[in-house]
UniProtKB/Swiss-Prot annotation:
Protein name per UniProt: Semaphorin-6B
Subunit-structure text: Homodimer. Binds specifically the SH3 domain of the protooncogene C-SRC.
Organism: Mus musculus
Membrane topology type: Single-pass type I membrane protein
GO cellular component: plasma membrane
Domain Sema: 32-525
Length: 886
């Protein structure tokens, strides 16, 4: 059998893949790799805090792992908010190899609060006091809030001694119930501004103002126009407003299912709420707008998920905030850094409003002539038309309540991201910025932290022009911050333990404070010692923190340093600086575990698709060919069977005599032809009550196959005739026609009874008529109508005859039926194979009662009188019975 073989790869396929690779590089430009990758062995030199106290090298034996929630740096002191504990850690000296706490505050939940928490269905590990708010209230006071087993509580503590100051207060609307929920908080003018949830089920999201000398205010409750499942990220104070940065589901895109967008909202610090009729004890200055961080083009590519925001910094004389955005989890992985000018943010809140006139309509801008005056959202103050927000007209208050969304989005500086990283293994979620890097303090370094603790360091050069664009950012370095030997191995800590919580710059010590759930690591901002001994590498690193010293070392440069050094952050050619071993770019991509090449990924995907398509095509072709080959083999097998062993199955039974006469056995041979004795073909023709052994075992007479029925003599299908009238039993042509039709109909469901060819050689032995024959006439006379019963056959030697045999049992209850089936007499001419077996003698030829079916011409001379069928005719036609078969 032919088996297909898969052809070898053709040069055309290889050429196609190479061409595809070239096109891919053109469509997806490769992102620049870092100029340097810090070796992982440097992690062992970084100081780490894991809960160790004074005089301890490690945490106390048997102590729980840390579960850090908040980190606050105040000058040279670091406060770490943990589960049930608050630590005070001194950051000096900066050369220490271990960070230890100097003071520790244990703040556990009450047993009653824990019992209530467990009754509400929470786990034991959740019913603890997690520090979620950690703020500096004044120069000597810390404001701390904890979840307190899903019953938030807040208190004031001394910053120096961690002693409780005053009584505790409720943390509702100031601290979330669940430690997994996000929240932001800040103090401004002695008032606490928080953004969190106010209920146990985290349904009611709120921006809340409390404490201070002004009334408590909150956002409208359960209004999707104000909030729709928000996730609060950061809050900053600027001017007379407090700005909140968050992401939420956009109601203006309700026709696009759930679309997450980034927002900035603001409220006036001096807002005192609305009138008793509208917005009482609620914000009257709350407005929100969208943050636009997208790649420009015919169709903008948006980074909609806000991850982190810096404080307000000055870049080129502008108040700027930097924000990290990412794509949704079900989209192409990517992150971007966009900068926003606070002046442009404020200008958007002075623009047009957006509204939805009906729940089914889309959101459209509100015409300026429909905006009431004074402008909704403004800060009412003494000296203005309205001295306080509570004095505003109801028209303005109603407009603010129903139109909190601005029509325009806040554009990013340069209308494009400053930094874009796509197809990273982990998204960027944290950001820290140093706007005074370098010996002259005029360089801007951006540190981006990923979910797994990998930090990317970029040098950005913002343009001081009005457009606010920036030049190409330089990817300086990539380094790790998570210490698995102290913070826990990824196999045990998992992704949760390695998640980067915060990234804060400690410029005084030249380091970064990276907080993880189980540890806090201080990492230097630069590793200049890696380039010592090679001037080309030190200067080629373009790192503002590093410079080449005359003694042949690469040193760390602090702002205002007076040391002599060489540095080039512009990226000029270093060809004239000589060569040295371990060139910088030669070892860049040795261990870039956090990045994946776009070109490699796209090319591999397309190549896998092409190869899979080719293999699938060959597989389908092979299976189709296999099915065709099996079908061909099946047809050949059938033909072989018919040609060798089954020829008698398709030949006319009337030709068996010729096959026997011409076969190897001939008539007198013993073989009986190549297909065996023809009696084997006739055995299945016998029905119940007739023996097959008489044909298979033979007898004293051979079977004359020439006398078998031909297709022309095959009876026609039986057609049931209408029942004649009971009085139609008189003599005449009508009675004969009825009997003739009865005989024809009964013959169609009967067997073929054959007589041997040598029947004429046997003497005629008269036999006594059986009981059925003697009773035939009386029973037939009693019949009122013909029944579907077979006829009694009679032998006739003159020609081939077809008679009827019984095909089913007779119903003895029918008293007016025709005579029952005929049984052959027990004569000496019929031999039995056993004492009880049926006769095995060959059957004699019989005559068909339907003379119309006899084949004309060519018959042998008649040796016996024709059979008498008068007993089947209606009453009065005769009393004769059929003579027995001799």
């Amino acid at each position: 059998m032919w088996t297909p073989r898969v052809p070898p790869p053709r040069p055309a396929l290889s050429f196609f893949l190479l061409l595809l690779l070239g096109v891919t590089y053109g469509l997806f430009p490769e992102e620049p790799p870092p100029l340097s990758v810090a070796p992982r062995d440097y992690l062992s030199h970084y100081p780490v805090f894991v809960g160790s106290g004074p005089g301890r090298l490690t945490a106390a034996e048997g102590a729980e792992d840390l579960n850090i929630q908040r980190v606050l740096r105040v000058n040279r002191t670091l406060f770490i908010g943990d589960r049930d504990n608050l630590y005070q850690v001194e950051l000096e000296p900066s050369t220490s190899t271990e960070l230890r706490y100097q003071r520790k505050l244990t703040w556990r939940s009450n047993p009653s609060d824990i019992d209530v928490c467990r009754m509400k269905g929470k786990q034991e590990g959740e019913c603890r006091n997690f520090v979620k708010v950690l703020l500096l209230r004044d120069e000597s006071t810390l404001f701390v809030c904890g979840s307190n087993a899903f019953n938030p509580i807040c208190a004031n503590y001394s910053m120096d001694t961690l002693q409780l100051l005053g009584d505790s207060i409720s943390g509702m609307a100031r601290c979330p119930y669940d430690p997994k929920h996000a929240n932001v908080a800040l103090f401004s003018d002695g008032m606490l501004f928080t953004a969190t949830v106010t209920d146990f089920l985290a349904i009611d999201a709120v921006i809340y103002r409390s404490l201070g000398d002004r009334p408590t205010l909150r956002t409208v409750k359960h209004d999707s126009k104000w909030f729709k499942e928000p996730y609060f990220v950061h809050a900053v104070e600027w001017g007379s407003h407090v700005y909140f940065f968050f992401r939420e589901i956009a109601m203006e895109f309700n026709y696009l299912e759930k679309v997450v967008v980034s927002r900035v909202a603001r409220v006036c610090k001096n807002d005192v709420g609305g009138s008793p009729r509208v917005l009482e004890k609620q914000w009257t200055s709350f407005l929100k707008a969208r943050l636009n961080c997208s790649v420009p083009g015919d169709s903008h590519f948006y980074f909609n998920v806000l991850q982190a925001v810096t404080g307000v910094v000055s870049l080129g004389g502008r108040p700027v905030i930097l924000a990290v955005f990412s794509t949704p989890s079900n989209s192409i992985p990517g992150s971007a850094v966009c900068a926003f000018d606070m002046n442009q943010v404020a200008a958007v809140f002075e623009g047009r409003f957006r509204e939805q006139k009906s729940p089914e309509s889309i959101w459209t801008p509100v015409p300026e002539d429909q905006v009431p005056r004074p402008r909704p959202g403004c800060c009412a103050a003494p000296g203005m038309q309205y001295n306080a927000s509570s004095a505003l007209p109801d028209e303005i208050l109603n407009f603010v309540k129903t139109h909190p969304l601005m029509d325009e989005a806040v554009p990013s500086l340069g209308h494009s991201p400053w930094i874009v990283r796509t197809l990273m293994r982990h998204q960027l979620t944290r950001v820290a910025v140093d706007v005074g890097a370098g010996p002259w303090g005029n360089q801007t370094i951006v540190f981006l932290g990923s979910e797994a603790g990998t930090v990317l360091k970029f040098l950005v050069k913002p343009n001081a022009s009005v457009s606010g664009t920036t030049g190409p950012s330089i990817f300086l370095e990539e380094f790790e911050t998570y210490r698995p030997d102290r913070c826990g191995r990824p196999s045990s800590a998992g992704e949760w333990g390695q998640r980067l919580l915060s990234l804060e710059l400690d410029a005084a010590s030249g380091g970064l404070l990276a907080a993880f759930p189980r540890c806090v690591v201080r990492v230097p901002v630069a590793r200049c010692q890696l380039y010592s001994g090679c001037m080309k590498n030190c200067i080629g690193s373009q790192d503002p923190y590093c410079g080449w010293a005359p003694d042949g070392s690469c040193i760390f440069l602090r702002p205002g340093t007076s040391a002599t050094f060489e540095q080039d952050v512009s990226g000029a050619s270093t060809s004239g600086l000589g060569d040295c071993t371990g060139l910088l770019r030669a070892s860049l991509s040795d261990d870039r575990a956090g990045l994946v090449s776009v070109n490699l990924l796209v090319t591999s995907s397309v190549a896998a698709f092409v190869v899979g398509a080719v293999v699938s095509g060959f597989s389908v072709g092979w299976f189709v060919g296999l099915r065709e080959r099996r079908e061909l083999a099946r047809r050949k097998d059938k033909e072989a069977i018919l040609a060798h062993g089954g020829s008698e199955a398709v030949l006319s039974v009337s030709r068996l005599g010729e096959r026997r006469g011409t076969g190897p056995g001939g008539r007198g041979g013993a073989g009986g032809g190549p297909g065996g004795p023809p009696e084997a073909l006739l055995a299945p023709l016998m029905q119940n009550g007739w023996t097959k052994a008489a044909l298979l075992h033979g007898g004293p007479h051979d079977l004359d196959t020439g006398l078998l029925p031909t297709p022309e003599q095959t009876p026609l299908p039986q057609k049931r005739l209408p029942t004649p009238h009971p009085h139609a039993h008189a003599l005449g042509s009508r009675a004969w026609d009825h009997s003739h039709a009865l005989l024809s109909a009964s013959a169609s469901t009967s067997l073929l009874l054959l007589a041997p060819a040598r029947a004429s050689e046997q003497p005629q032995v008269p036999a006594e008529p059986g009981p059925e024959s003697r009773l035939c006439a009386p029973r037939s006379c009693r019949a009122s109508h013909p029944g579907d019963f077979p006829l009694t056959p009679h032998a006739s030697p003159d020609r081939r005859r077809v008679v009827s045999a019984p095909t089913g049992p007779l119903d003895p209850s029918v008293g007016d039926g025709l005579p029952g089936p005929w049984s052959p007499p027990a004569t000496s001419s019929l031999r039995r194979p056993g004492p009880h077996g049926p006769p095995t003698a060959a059957l004699r030829r019989t005559h068909t009662f339907n003379s119309g079916e006899a084949r004309p011409g060519g018959h042998r001379p008649r040796r016996h009188p024709p059979a008498d069928s008068t007993h089947l005719l209606p009453c009065g036609t005769g009393e004769r019975t059929a003579p027995p078969v001799p």
